[in-house]
C-alpha cells in the first residue's frame, strides 16, 4: 500500500482545487452552454462543494494523527452521499421513468407559477433528471459525477486506513 505523505496539506488543498474546478465546469455548462441542472444535479453540486469545503478546512488546519481520520471520515460520508445521488441519477438515465420524477422544466415553471413560487424552484434546478444533455467519452454528467465521488471516497478511505509515514 502506498504510504500517506507526512504533510497532507497539499493533498487536501488539491482536493479543494479539484472540487472548485468541477463546480466551475458545472457553472460553465449551465451559463454558457445552456444546460439547465436538474434537482439531482444541484444536490451533487452541493455535495462537491461540501467535499471542497471540508478539504479546504483540512488543508488550512493541517491535521495530524486522529485529525486526518476525522477529515477523512467527513470526506467519505460526503462523497458517499453525493455518489448515491449520482448513482440514482445514472440509474434513472439507464432506465428512464415514464413520468419524470424530478419535476417540471424551466419553461413550464415560468409559465405556470407566479415568479415568487417559480424562483425557489428555479434555484433548485430545472429539467428531467433522466435526460442526458451532455456526454464526454460516452459518459453523462451523472456518470462523471459518480466517478469523481468514487475517487473522493477512495481518497477518504486512504486517509482513514492508509499507512502513515513516521
UniProtKB/Swiss-Prot annotation:
> Which compartment or compartments is the protein found in?
Cell inner membrane
Entry GO terms, CC: plasma membrane
InterPro entries given in the database record: DiS_bond_form_DsbB/BdbC, Disulphide_bond_form_DsbB, DsbB, DsbB-like_sf
Quote the gene name from the UniProt entry: dsbB
| Ranges in the topological domain labelled Cytoplasmic | 1-11, 64-70, 163-166
- The protein's name is Disulfide bond formation protein B
Q: Which residues lie on this side of the membrane: Periplasmic?
A: 29-46, 88-143
Q: Which organism is it from?
A: Azoarcus sp. (strain BH72)
Which Pfam families does this one have? DsbB (PF02600)
